[in-house]
Amino acid sequence: PTALPVGDPAADAPAAGRVLETLLAGQTSAAGTPQDEAPAALSSSAGVLRLTAVVTQTTAARLELESITDLNGRCESLTAVAPPPLTAAADPDAATALRARLDRLAGCRPETWLADTEDPTAAVVADEAQVALLTGTDPEIDASTLVPLEDDGRVLPEGRLTAVGSAATLDDDAERRIAEVMSALDGDGLRELERLTTGDDPLPPAEAAQYWLVDHGLEDAPEDWFVPRGSWF
């Protein structure tokens, strides 16, 4: 096992930020009126988006894994898989930063990284990979009964969704509504949005956002919509 650093400053914070930006680039989009001034942060999501290392129940039991640091010294014989945007082919810099964090902070140096899979969950379920890095809100973690490894030391990057814009162009009601939306984006809210935009029949981001806003009572449903009494989720 590798002696892991304790209490070190996050010297690779810019690189970790690159990992998050790359991961979210394909899942989010910006909209609005262009502004002459630089945008400012208006509100952040209540829930945290973080990468999470997951394994099957069989792998967790065989290697006695509970925490990501339990992988220390055990990754050399394992194959790992990351989300498609974080592969070396898609973004070499982000992939290098992510692998360096795993090596330095968790002592995990997988023998192989899968390079051509579009579905990391399916790869780990089929034992093509033994460790998958997924967003913690990925609904497939529970659906496939995968085991998320604890990460109290924040080895893997995390962050929040942030609404940006010009406060000077917004009235109090608009700012309040933005804050309401971001407050509803807690862990469950983020998981619901991810369920709508992933899977076998994903919705386009704008359509998924509309369904989510209507379900949370943050937008009126169009007249031709059928809205269930409970929730779509």
Q: What residue spans do the PLM features occupy?
A:
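Ligand-binding cleft/hinge of the Venus flytrap
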Residues: 1, 68-114, 215
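N-terminal hydrophobic or amphipathic helices and topogenic motifs
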Residues: 1-13, 65, 83, 189-233
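Short helix-initiation/N-cap motifs at beta->coil->alpha
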Residues: 1-19, 107-123
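A ligand-binding cleft/hinge motif common to bilobed small-molecule-binding domains
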Residues: 13-24, 32-38, 122-150, 155
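Periplasmic-binding protein-like
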Residues: 39-52, 139-182
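A conserved helix-loop-strand patch within extracytoplasmic ligand-binding domains
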Residues: 40-87, 183-187
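Hydrophobic multi-pass inner-membrane translocation pores used for secretion
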Residues: 120-121, 131-134, 156-157, 161-163, ...
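Structured C-terminal subdomain patch of bacterial secreted/periplasmic proteins
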Residues: 155, 167-210
